[in-house]
């Protein structure tokens, strides 16, 4: 378990399965290939708060899979067992990470996540070892992915 406090914290669980507590402030959570199964527990009601999920090198926007599970948001790197869950995402906006940012500078805002979740809900998640989306998935999802990641 890694815990931040007040202020801007950077939390990186590395490999393995971790719980990351952000606290208040503009926190950065790191997620990459080899990260394992991590969980973010973030609750911040501060106006203008800007927490970021930083996605490591070698992960493209087309490799991220978004799912609504209970009250949580799960983000997986397809082809791997790596997953990060943002606990209680669907309970209240105070639990949100406000931005998802890739190493090449692409950004997805929390207000855009549900469009991807809804589109991906119509498909089964790619199986372990499948590192790219099938042609059918690409046709359906790539326009939406490109429209929301800027």
Segments the model singles out, each with a brief description of its role:
Residues 1-69, 80-96:
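Acidic, glycine-rich calcium-binding repeat modules characteristic of RTX/beta-roll
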Residues 76-150:
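Low-complexity acidic/polar repeat-biased segments
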């Amino acid at each position: 378990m890694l815990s931040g406090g007040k202020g801007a914290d950077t939390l990186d669980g590395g490999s393995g399965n971790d719980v990351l507590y952000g606290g208040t402030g503009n926190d950065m959570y790191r997620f990459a290939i080899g990260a394992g199964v991590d969980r973010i527990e973030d609750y911040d009601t501060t106006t203008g708060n800007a927490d970021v999920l930083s996605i490591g090198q070698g992960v493209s926007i087309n490799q991220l899979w978004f799912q609504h599970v209970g009250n949580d948001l799960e983000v997986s790197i397809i082809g791997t067992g790596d997953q990060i869950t943002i606990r209680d995402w669907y309970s209240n906006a105070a639990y949100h990470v406000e931005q998802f940012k890739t190493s090449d500078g692409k950004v997805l805002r929390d207000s855009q996540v549900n469009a991807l979740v809804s589109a991906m809900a119509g498909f089964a998640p790619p199986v372990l070892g499948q590192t790219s989306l099938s042609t059918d998935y690409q046709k359906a999802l790539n326009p939406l992915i490109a429209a929301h990641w800027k």
